[in-house]
Design a protein with these regions (language model features):
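Bacterial lipoprotein signal-peptidase II cleavage site
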Residues: 21-29
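Bacterial N-terminal signal peptides that target proteins for export
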Residues: 1-10
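Sequence signature of WD/YWTD-type beta-propeller architectures
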Residues: 35-377
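C-terminal motif of bacterial Sec signal peptides marking the signal peptidase cleavage site
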Residues: 16-19
Length: 377
């Protein structure tokens, strides 16, 4: 994924553990670069195995694309949604592929059972191994810079940045203790900012550190230097250009960090799993309702308020474009783990401009392209 790129996959691994609360907030602003030289620069990756993505037709330049599945078929595909009424599959992934996402409009990345992060061109040809990681909690969560030239990933407790300067460890965080998980509060967000200048890692599992080992950090993408750290935060998302990071604590308003103004309190929204629109004007997210199931909300970045929300029984929202938002239907389930809602099997697409909802043929969405478009605020 993106954005958050891999936040859902990382959290799904630990949801089998249980449920519990989170830490109280504390903050540090002291830059503390901790990177060290590595061995696998993105500029000279290792030749990889045969590609696990296969395209039956050329991918049109500039079209809107999605990696996901279509109702009735578990095969993960690259689907052209430039014309939503006439969407079509362009490529398929082998069933062994894990965590696929776009590197660009012409290349994808995925993980293998051998713990490799692979880059493959949609036009065919050889693949490249960008990084390998060990087995363990949080290992393999990864994200690309907007230009596809840098990669950040987690290898157990170590946070890596791979660029033309090499593969460096930005920091090593405290080990994640065995504990329960709160699905609506715990999160792991790893993502480059829309302008590519910063990388954020905000999570609720590797706790107990401060400064360079704090659980919530923003680092400069050019050199890995720490520019902001805090703790006790969750559910982060980048939005707008110049890039600003939004996040929240267990209580209180959403907070916004930017390089110039620091941290500013915003509207009070207890959002869950937020995602930004490509143009940075909107953030969509799940909200817990009084019925026990979720609804989907839409936050206007310029207005600093929730502009609209759906009926209850919707969650897992992702932007397909600057206007269209995809999400799943859900219903209450008293026998499910932790009393969590369960999917209905129906998915939807919502138009913000039209304030309207239709059913969708997409049964899952892993990533979309483009991730960043103009204009942005």
């Amino acid at each position: 994924m993106t954005a958050s790129a891999m936040r859902g996959a990382a959290l799904a691994v630990v949801l089998v553990v249980g449920a519990c609360g989170g830490p109280s907030p504390s903050t540090s602003h002291t830059p503390s670069p901790t990177s060290s030289a590595g061995t696998s620069p993105l500029s000279s990756p290792t030749s990889g195995p045969a590609s696990l993505v296969h395209c039956t037709t050329a991918v049109p330049a500039g079209d809107s694309l999605v990696i996901g599945t279509v109702a009735g078929d578990a095969t993960i595909v690259v689907r052209d949604i430039q014309d939503p009424a006439h969407a079509r599959n362009l490529c398929t992934f082998d069933s062994s592929v894990l965590a696929p996402q776009f590197v660009s409009g012409t290349a994808v990345a995925y993980e293998t059972a051998e713990n490799q992060i692979i880059k493959a061109n949609l036009s065919g040809g050889p693949t490249t191994i960008l990084a390998t990681y060990s087995s363990g909690f949080d290992s393999g969560q990864y994200a690309f810079s907007p230009d596809g030239q840098s990669l950040t990933y987690l290898d157990s407790n170590a946070w890596h940045l791979v660029s033309s300067a090499g593969n460096r460890v930005l920091t090593t965080l405290p080990a994640a203790p065995g504990r329960g998980v709160s699905p609506d509060e715990d999160d792991s967000f790893l993502s480059f900012s829309p302008d590519g200048q910063y990388i954020a890692y905000f999570q609720t599992f590797h706790t107990g550190g401060t400064g360079a080992t704090a659980p919530d950090q923003v680092r400069r993408a050019s050199d890995g230097a720490l520019v902001y750290s805090t703790s006790g935060m969750t559910m982060a998302v980048w939005a707008s250009l110049p890039s600003r990071l939004y996040f929240r604590a267990a209580t209180g308003p959403v907070l916004r960090w930017d390089p110039s103004a620091g941290v500013t309190p915003m509207d009070s929204i207890h959002w869950i799993r937020p995602h930004q629109s490509p143009d940075g004007r909107w953030i969509t997210y799940s909200l817990r309702t009084s019925t026990g199931v979720h609804g989907v909300g839409f936050y206007g970045v310029q207005a600093d308020s929730q502009i609209a929300s759906t009926a209850a029984g919707r969650s897992g929202a992702r932007f397909l474009s600057n206007d269209l938002v995809w999400y799943i239907g859900e219903r209450a389930c008293s026998t499910c783990f932790g009393g969590q809602p369960t999917p209905t099997g129906v998915t939807y697409i919502y138009s913000i401009a039209g304030a309207s909802e239709i059913t969708s043929r997409l049964s899952a969405v892993h990533d979309v392209w483009p991730r960043v478009t103009a204009p942005a605020v």
